Amino acid sequence: MAHSVKIYDTCIGCTQCVRACPTDVLEMVPWNGCRAKQIASAPRTEDCVGCKRCESACPTDYLSVRVYLRNETTRSMGLAY
């Protein structure tokens, strides 16, 4: 089972996460929801190694891209309500 990579609509289209990913999991796709007219997408999650470099590179303080490791759930991370 691969890790789950979630891209949220707070993405500003800066490409930092795409450049930080060592396994090319992420790519930019056209999107009209931000000034950059593009958003990160994760079409190759099976290649994700769970390093979370994309999270660290994100200038929106982890609000745009999140990597959930295989055994990680929103409940185990204290995010469930």
From Swiss-Prot:
Catalyzed reaction equations: reduced [plastocyanin] + hnu + oxidized [2Fe-2S]-[ferredoxin] = oxidized [plastocyanin] + reduced [2Fe-2S]-[ferredoxin]
Organism: Gnetum parvifolium (Small-leaved jointfir)
Membrane topology, record value: Peripheral membrane protein
This protein's GO CC annotations: chloroplast thylakoid membrane; photosystem I
InterPro entries attached to this UniProt entry: 4Fe4S_Fe-S-bd, 4Fe4S_Fe_S_CS, PSI_iron-sulfur_center, PSI_PsaC
Cofactor dependence: [4Fe-4S] cluster
Subcellular location: Plastid, Chloroplast thylakoid membrane
Name under which the protein is recorded: Photosystem I iron-sulfur center
Enzyme Commission number(s): 1.97.1.12
PROSITE patterns tied to this protein: 4FE4S_FER_1, 4FE4S_FER_2
GO BP terms: photosynthetic electron transport in photosystem I
Residues annotated as binding [4Fe-4S] cluster 1: C11, C14, C17, C58
